[in-house]
């Protein structure tokens, strides 16, 4: 097993892997991640098996001697291909422990990807964290809306939606992550 630090030359391979992983999310596409390049020192990792096949990636940044599941993202953790098995994830963590020691990294802060984003639900990483005596330092709440079901809005929410319609507010899909991020951070402040 081989672990390599992500470089700009890896962008296409990285993005292709993200699109095909079983626990994917657009957060992990490089254009989205690099929005934070001025705030975080990227230390994303690519993990290859013995046949040189990319089997996992870890969006990450480094600060001092700590490797973080990327701090510029709401969540992170390993993205894996659809053939990932628990035994392989255990091997990845063993390789990762050796790798971080060689890099003089003292600790990893790991944020799991919420299961709702898994195309093929699995939690090899969580099990591996347990097997490695990882310490839980934070637990976040995950809430989802099933868009195939009719949403039942409260009166206040209906009023807000009708007001937005009267103001001709538009909603549409876009790949413009920078503008999305500006809107999102404005709303969350």
Specify the residue positions occupied by each region the protein language model found:
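Acyltransferase donor/substrate-recognition loop-hinge adjacent to the catalytic core
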Residues: 1-11, 122-189
């Amino acid at each position: 097993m081989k672990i390599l630090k992500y470089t700009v030359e890896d962008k296409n391979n990285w993005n292709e892997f993200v699109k095909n992983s079983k626990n994917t999310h657009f957060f992990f596409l490089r254009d989205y991640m690099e929005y934070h390049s001025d705030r975080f020192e990227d230390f994303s990792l690519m993990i290859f098996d013995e046949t040189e096949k990319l089997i996992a990636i870890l969006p990450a940044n480094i600060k001092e001697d700590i490797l973080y599941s990327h701090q510029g993202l709401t969540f992170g953790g390993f993205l894996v291909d659809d053939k990932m098995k628990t035994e392989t994830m255990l091997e990845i963590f063993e390789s990762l422990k050796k790798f971080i020691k060689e890099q003089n990294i003292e600790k990893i802060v790991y944020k799991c990807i919420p299961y709702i984003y898994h195309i093929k639900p699995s939690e090899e990483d969580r099990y591996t964290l347990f097997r490695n005596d990882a310490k839980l330092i934070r637990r976040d709440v995950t809430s989802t809306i099933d868009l195939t079901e009719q949403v039942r809005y409260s009166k206040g929410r209906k009023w807000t939606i009708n007001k937005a319609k009267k103001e001709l507010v538009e909603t549409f899909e876009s790949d413009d992550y920078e503008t999305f991020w500006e809107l999102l951070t404005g709303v969350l402040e």
